[in-house]
């Protein structure tokens, strides 16, 4: 028993020398490094560094305008003046830029027509009365054809008024109403003259507009 106690007492110093004390992980090991990683305070930035950072901000991200500038709107006169200046052409038009025309082109010539179409529609409206007038007026698209139809219908109206007035087959149509006879007679005469006069004016248009810029002509029948 005494020998066992003596052996145990001899082994304890040797084992105690091999142990190592461990640190607690929750305790901070190096507080100096944590303090070193923190950013410096604003008071430590010098005046030159502050000016440098202000310059960088102004160049990359410009500051917005002040409240007075942002909320100031132009007056009504200024807005109208700006709108007027925007509509003014940069290069004003000049008359010499347009090229004169020696004669009407094919489309204008088709729109005006010729004497043959005028005479054809004139006799159609004169011989076939209102049926010939509607056919010749609707089937032709030229001014000569339509003016010929109007003139022929006017002469046809005069023809039938004279037939009814002086014929023995239609007695009593205008008894006591001679003003109505005169109204239809004057109306037919005006239609006849209008067709001839307007067609004569249209025929002179190629000569009138030969030296003028290109112009659209609207025929009102």
From Swiss-Prot:
It is a multi-pass membrane protein. A motif (PPxY motif 2) lies at residues 64-67. Residues 2-116, 165-172 are cytoplasmic. Pfam families: NEDD4_Bsd2 (PF10176). Keywords: Acetylation, Cell projection, Endosome, Golgi apparatus, Membrane, Repeat, Secreted, Synapse, Synaptosome, Transmembrane, Transmembrane helix, Ubl conjugation. Ubiquitinated by NEDD4; mono-, di- and polyubiquitinated forms are detected. Ubiquitination regulates its degradation. Undergoes transient tyrosine phosphorylation following EGF stimulation, most probably by catalyzed by SRC. Phosphorylation SRC is enhanced in the presence of NDFIP2 which may act as a scaffold to recruit SRC to NDFIP1. The chain crosses the membrane at residues 117-137, 144-164, 173-193. GO terms for cellular component: cell cortex; dendrite; endosome membrane; extracellular region; Golgi apparatus; Golgi membrane; membrane; perinuclear region of cytoplasm. Residues 42-76 are annotated as: Interaction with ITCH. A motif (PPxY motif 3) lies at residues 74-76. Induction: Up-regulated after traumatic brain injury in surviving neurons around the lesion site. Disruption phenotype: Mutant mice appear normal at birth, but develop severe skin and gastrointestinal tract inflammation around 6 to 8 weeks of age. They do not survive beyond 14 weeks. This phenotype is due to the lack of activity of ITCH E3 ubiquitin-protein ligase, and consequently, prolongation of JUNB half-life after T-cell activation. This results in an increased production of T-helper 2 (Th2) cytokines and in the promotion of Th2-mediated inflammation. This subsequently leads to increased number of circulating, esophagus and small bowel eosinophils. A motif (PPxY motif 1) lies at residues 39-42. One of its GO terms (molecular function) is WW domain binding. Its main location: membrane. CDD domains: NDFIP1 (cd22305). Changing residue 67 to A: Alters interaction with NEDD4. Highly expressed in embryonic and early postnatal cortex (at protein level). Widely expressed. Hardly detectable in resting T-cells; up-regulated in T-cells in response to activation. Residues 2-41 are annotated as: Interaction with UBE2L3. The keyword Transmembrane applies. Forms heterodimers with NDFIP2. Interacts with several E3 ubiquitin-protein ligases, including ITCH, NEDD4, NEDD4L and WWP2. The interaction with NEDD4, NEDD4L and ITCH leads to relocalization of these proteins to exosomes and eventually to exosomal secretion. Interacts with U2SURP. Interacts with SLC11A2/DMT1. Interacts with PTEN. May interact with phosphorylated EGFR. Interacts with BRAT1. Interacts with KCNH2. Interacts with MAVS. Part of a complex containing ITCH, NDFIP1 and MAP3K7. Interacts (via N-terminus) with UBE2L3; the interaction mediates recruitment of UBE2L3 to ITCH. The PPxY motifs are required for E3 ubiquitin-protein ligase binding and activation and for ubiquitination. This is NEDD4 family-interacting protein 1. It comes from Mus musculus.
């Amino acid at each position: 028993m005494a020998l066992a106690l003596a052996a145990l007492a001899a082994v304890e110093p040797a084992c105690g020398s091999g142990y190592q004390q461990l640190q607690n992980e929750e305790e901070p090991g190096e507080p100096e490094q944590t303090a070193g990683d923190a950013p410096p305070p604003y008071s430590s930035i010098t005046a030159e560094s502050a000016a440098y950072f202000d310059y960088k901000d102004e160049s990359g991200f410009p500051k917005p305008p002040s409240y007075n500038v942002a909320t100031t709107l132009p007056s009504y006169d200024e807005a109208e003046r700006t709108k007027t200046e925007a509509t003014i052409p940069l290069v004003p038009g000049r008359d010499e830029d347009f090229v004169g025309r020696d004669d009407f082109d094919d489309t204008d010539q088709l729109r005006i027509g010729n004497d043959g179409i005028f005479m054809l529609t004139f006799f159609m409206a004169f011989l076939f009365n209102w049926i010939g007038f509607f056919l010749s007026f609707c089937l032709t698209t030229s001014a000569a054809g339509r003016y010929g139809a109007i003139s022929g219908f006017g002469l046809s109206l005069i023809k039938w008024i004279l037939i009814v007035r002086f014929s023995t087959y239609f007695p009593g149509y205008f008894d006591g109403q001679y003003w109505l006879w005169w109204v239809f007679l004057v109306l037919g005469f005006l239609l006849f003259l209008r067709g001839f006069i307007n067609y004569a004016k249209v025929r002179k248009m190629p000569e009138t507009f030969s030296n003028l810029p290109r112009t659209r002509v609207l025929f009102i029948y």
